[in-house]
């Protein structure tokens, strides 16, 4: 273990351990922490990642269950010691507790995260996902519904808002509320952050639920064409081309697209 001034890889860069959380507040002369300055309509995000590059290749890069693992535990606890009311860190700590099987403590931390910042879509999504994973669909529906009230009124959805509403759309689709799910999918792809996951999920919905082969294919292609390419959605579109278009040549191109991509 290096000394306190040593540098370690963090978010793909060499960053001193003491600076791992961006813009950590420092106490003023009275011992109080100043208010964090935030751009208008843009909330600060203190989520700790292993690295931005690896996260971009995950199925859902804004889901805390995708970008968090136990190797981050010490960093998250350290962050909470300095900022005990930070919504991002509380949510991420809840995910860690869930991974350790401490579901009661996990829910307490996740609930506190959304109480501290009701506009934190990533925390709401983590809370909803946690309830799904612990087989509590009734409570999950309540949480997603409450989260929707905070995210839906926004004219433009950012990445976290889109990811939250996508999780909600998938959840209510599984519950059989097809019309409501379709409205959510449409909202995400028209007003949300453009991502392979949202485009692909809507494409699958159109293909498998609405039985619209042509329109479903359009969205699957859009998902596969996004850079950096998603292995999952390139493969899904390749399979679509083989199954519905009998186009082996194009299917092979998309199957190879990930390995040929140069950033």
Swiss-Prot record:
Pfam assignment, any one: TPR_8
InterPro entries: CFAP70, TPR-like_helical_dom_sf, TPR_rpt
PANTHER family per record: CILIA- AND FLAGELLA-ASSOCIATED PROTEIN 70
Residue stretches of biased makeup (Basic and acidic residues): 1-25
Name of the molecule in the record: TPR repeat-containing protein DDB_G0285095
Source domain of life: Eukaryota
Region (Disordered): 1-62
UniProt keyword annotations, A-Z: Repeat, TPR repeat
TPR repeat residue intervals: 87-120, 121-154, 162-195
Keyword hit for Repeat: yes
Keyword Repeat: yes
Species of origin: Dictyostelium discoideum (Social amoeba)
